[in-house]
Amino acid sequence: MSTKMTGSVKWFNETKGFGFLTQDNGGNDVFVHFNSIQSEGFKTLAEGQRVSFIVEQGKKGPQASNVVAL
């Protein structure tokens, strides 16, 4: 079962459509792809923005899914 986490955006590159999130619990930074952002229209995140997300195992390591701006 996946656990909902909270954290903030470390950085996000709008042009490339990916970035990294910092977990509030102090865990490793988590990769985030724009396809995982739950919003309407242009999907992007701002540095320092608060988010909730689920950490899943991606092909290259931990990856965020179901990312929602708080």
UniProtKB/Swiss-Prot annotation:
<dbReference type="GO" id="GO:0010468">
    <property type="term" value="P:regulation of gene expression"/>
</dbReference>
<dbReference type="InterPro" id="IPR050181">
    <property type="entry name" value="Cold_shock_domain"/>
</dbReference>
<keyword id="KW-0010">Activator</keyword>
<dbReference type="InterPro" id="IPR012340">
    <property type="entry name" value="NA-bd_OB-fold"/>
</dbReference>
<dbReference type="Pfam" id="PF00313">
    <property type="entry name" value="CSD"/>
</dbReference>
<dbReference type="GO" id="GO:0005829">
    <property type="term" value="C:cytosol"/>
</dbReference>
<keyword id="KW-0963">Cytoplasm</keyword>
<keyword id="KW-0346">Stress response</keyword>
<dbReference type="GO" id="GO:0003677">
    <property type="term" value="F:DNA binding"/>
</dbReference>
<dbReference type="InterPro" id="IPR012156">
    <property type="entry name" value="Cold_shock_CspA"/>
</dbReference>
<dbReference type="GO" id="GO:0003676">
    <property type="term" value="F:nucleic acid binding"/>
</dbReference>
<dbReference type="InterPro" id="IPR011129">
    <property type="entry name" value="CSD"/>
</dbReference>
<keyword id="KW-0805">Transcription regulation</keyword>
<feature type="domain" description="CSD">
    <location>
        <begin position="7"/>
        <end position="67"/>
    </location>
</feature>
<keyword id="KW-0804">Transcription</keyword>
<keyword id="KW-0238">DNA-binding</keyword>
<dbReference type="InterPro" id="IPR002059">
    <property type="entry name" value="CSP_DNA-bd"/>
</dbReference>
<protein>
    <recommendedName>
        <fullName>Cold shock protein CspV</fullName>
    </recommendedName>
</protein>
